């Protein structure tokens, strides 16, 4: 009953105090997506769709339909990868420099307050910020790497669940698998 009581008191705690307590326990993970890199110049999905579609020979009606459809990002990217030899769209994920979000993650990691960073981002801005801060980390982004990770070991792990711009072929495979799951569900 004491454990339950302690848990309930943490829930009623001031949110900032709660987060501070959790970070100080060094048991924290951060999960982040596309928005974290937006201020670094990496475009969000709607902007990517507009850029891609503006470069294709399509009529306005078809372009509008594709812009307004609820197609998952992964499926859109899979269609793009499979139907065009132009891979320059992937260069969009190589834009920018780390912003305050990436620097904050690196500072938390440098202080030993993080165990894992999980991201859906293809860009390498988190890694760049960690390198700049002198933080050692294990990068995990290929499917075959997940089975060999010692999740209990110390040290920061950066998990890129959609792959990395560093390995464009792996991104295509990941996108295909995720978009396939989206269609099945």
What are the residue ranges of the model-derived segments?
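Conserved catalytic-core helix/loop/strand module for nucleotide-ribose chemistry
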Residues: 2-185
């Amino acid at each position: 009953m004491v454990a339950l009581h302690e848990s309930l008191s943490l829930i009623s705690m001031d949110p900032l105090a709660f987060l501070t307590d959790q970070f100080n326990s060094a048991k924290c993970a951060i999960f982040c997506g596309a928005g974290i890199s937006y201020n670094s110049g990496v475009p969000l999905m709607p902007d990517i769709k507009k850029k891609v579609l503006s470069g294709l020979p399509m009529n306005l009606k078809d372009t509008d339909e594709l812009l307004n459809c609820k197609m998952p990002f992964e499926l859109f990217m899979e269609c793009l990868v499979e139907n065009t030899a132009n891979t320059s769209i992937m260069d969009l994920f190589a834009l920018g420099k780390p912003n305050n979000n990436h620097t904050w993650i690196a500072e938390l990691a440098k202080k030993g307050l993080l165990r894992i960073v999980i991201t859906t981002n293809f860009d390498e801005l988190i890694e760049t910020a960690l390198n700049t801060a002198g933080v050692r980390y294990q990068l995990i982004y290929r499917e075959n790497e997940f089975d060999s990770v010692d999740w209990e070991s110390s040290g920061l792990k950066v998990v890129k669940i959609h792959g990395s711009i560093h390995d464009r072929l792996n991104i295509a495979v990941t996108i295909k698998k995720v978009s396939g799951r989206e269609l099945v569900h």
